[in-house]
Amino acid sequence: MAEGEEPEKKRRRIEELNEKMVVDGGSGDRSEWQGRWDHVRKFLERTGPFTHPDFEASTESLQFLLDTCKILVIGAGGLGCELLKDLALSGFRHIHVVDMDTIDVSNLNRQFLFRPKDVGRPKAEVAADFVNDRVPGCSVVPHFKKIQDLDETFYRQFHIVVCGLDSVIARRWMNGMLLSLLIYEDGVLDPSSIIPLIDGGTEGFKGNARVILPGMTACIDCTLELYPPQINFPMCTIASMPRLPEHCVEYVRMLLWPKEKPFGDGVVLDGDDPKHIQWVYQKSLERAAEFNITGVTYRLTQGVVKRIIPAVASTNAVIAAACATEVFKIATSAYVPLNNYLVFNDVDGLYTYTFEAERKENCSACSQVPQDMQFTPSAKLQEVLDYLTENASLQMKSPAITTTLDGKNKTLYLQTVASIEERTRPNLSKTLKELGLVDGQELAVADVTTPQTVLFKLKFIS
């Protein structure tokens, strides 16, 4: 409305808009108005040169989007805000969003669903409220929790899952969850059990979008080598010769936290807990002052602890649009979906490239067969642990290793529970033979990167 309009004129204009509304199904819900979905109908109620060969234009596809299709968005940050907006305006009206984070003032420059008054509130709840208020008829249901806190029944209800995450671990866990929902009959995959995963990621002016059909195409773990490893600083530098503010934060995170246990025994440092970050920040300042290092800030501390990646709003918009387009293609079957990996880069000019990521036959996540591990009988369990964490195809974080000996389950090593870690630590220095393991022995490995236990088959070599 033009600025300075008289109240009476404003009122008349609002009444005119209301008169154009069409009651949807006689329910009294004025969430539909004449021509609201014309932009979507142009794609679904006529054919064109790019439509899927088997697509038949009809009104049913739009009704499926509006009334039936359920979409799960993981993450309500930079990508997530864009995704929620794009999906809601594309006709998807049944959306759930999961995010465990709260709004920080640094989010406001690019996460446009949030306002200064929202700082400190859960991202999922604020984003859902904003979209529900702004897009009539759309129902966004928020879940302020970790993805690991939701069970199989929850995930099974959705037609498509779309991720806007900044964590490789969370991506892998979500990938593993959708793989665990697959149903096989006599070794043949039941297509109706497949829940497509659309994954987007950004880093500065670079981004990617991919389409994953669990059990059919390359999964996250099949292409794990594509994700850059986290930057780690040498321990000797952190402990004795710090030169950067990041060194001070890493010193507190890696050495002081487990030593001083400021919040009790067994409490893991949580990058989303303000009390934890404040403690690390204060200790980092003390460490920096000791070595005359400047530049330690609260924001830097949180960035180092959470491994925060720089974000650019325009990149988020492009990748979210690509992901939302793929969701639309798959939900309606109107167009052939991406096959299956899109790369975007606008550092120098504009560059995009699409290629087909290939599925790994021996992928530890989706291959359905135990992966071979080759060691000598004299190799120590520590070497197996190093293999699980350092191998580019596995990149596990805190693997727990169990096996079956004499018909009983035996935990060889588990580091996430302090009492069990202390009891099983001596096993790390023992050889595989001393532990009673034999050629062909199956090892079950659990890790934070997957909701499933991963099976490995031990193969002794000379």
From Swiss-Prot:
Pathway: Protein modification; protein neddylation. Residues 52-69, 156-160, 191-216, 330-337 are annotated as: Interaction with ube2m N-terminus. One of its GO terms (molecular function) is ATP binding. ATP binds at residues 99-123, 147-170. PROSITE patterns: UBIQUITIN_ACTIVAT_2. It comes from the Eukaryota. The active site is at C236 (glycyl thioester intermediate). Disulfide bonds: none annotated. Its EC number is 6.2.1.64. SMART domains: E2_bind. GO terms for cellular component: cytoplasm; nucleus. It catalyses: ATP + [NEDD8 protein] + [E1 NEDD8-activating enzyme]-L-cysteine = AMP + diphosphate + [E1 NEDD8-activating enzyme]-S-[NEDD8 protein]-yl-L-cysteine. One of its GO terms (biological process) is protein neddylation. Arg-210 acts as a selectivity gate, preventing misactivation of ubiquitin by this NEDD8-specific E1 complex. Heterodimer of uba3 and nae1. Interacts with nedd8, ube2f and ube2m. Belongs to the ubiquitin-activating E1 family. UBA3 subfamily. This is NEDD8-activating enzyme E1 catalytic subunit.
